[in-house]
């Protein structure tokens, strides 16, 4: 009982600090003190990707997904990236999430590795934004996010056929053999040459069901399905695009715990246009508004440590309601929050 009371006192204090004050006219850029790469190595289990405070989306690179080393999907000591998935745990020390892995690549579509070395010196991350160059493919990847949607921008530099792998079977698991079995049910539909919708039911740390809408700003000209392995329920799709060197493809992913319609509404309300820079700026603004609620003095190093800690603290818990306030609760029930908030991932 004492432990429970202590937890709620801590949570209340955090709430008073961050939720009771509404600052306006913020001038200083507090995001410049955040280093998302802190904790990416030595089993720190943090990720460098893009998210907003307490959002459902944490879109980030994955360098591995089949051991305790990859609870957040990424270890900066690795030399290659296997794709970019839409949600991640942060600092928890348990594997889960990593839903919908997407990898842009070029050249031979039968590439069996589906991963690339990356230029660590050109990797960038700050609140609400991440970018990296996949050196094997010559593709620049940029990521940003809203509360319920992820946005990708892939710039293809090489004069080779452009492709995107959409892996609906992938996820972050404890051991590699679970990659074939953690998806226990899946449905997928190709609406047109711009859209993919569906749902997955998965079981790793807990059993979850999520619905998705994936949209491209350019039509794919061809699509292939990779041969599934024994026990797999979800599909892996290879999409080809007609691009010239230097052109890009943008991808948006909406998620919902309730329905495909909920994921679609998230895209319509939060991310209706193909304006990557606008979403990036809004995400940074959301973080700066939160971080600015506490102003501290100290050295540059001390400020980086402090504001990065606040940043990591406010990635979770995650508001899993749809735009209309509905969410999937215990026993697979659909519930409604009149304030549009219901928090999951209550791990500290």
Where are these regions (language model features)?
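Bacterial N-terminal signal peptides
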Residues: 9-18
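Bacterial Sec-dependent signal peptides at the C-terminal "C-region" and cleavage site
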Residues: 18-28
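Accessory carbohydrate-recognition regions in carbohydrate-active enzymes
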Residues: 26-348
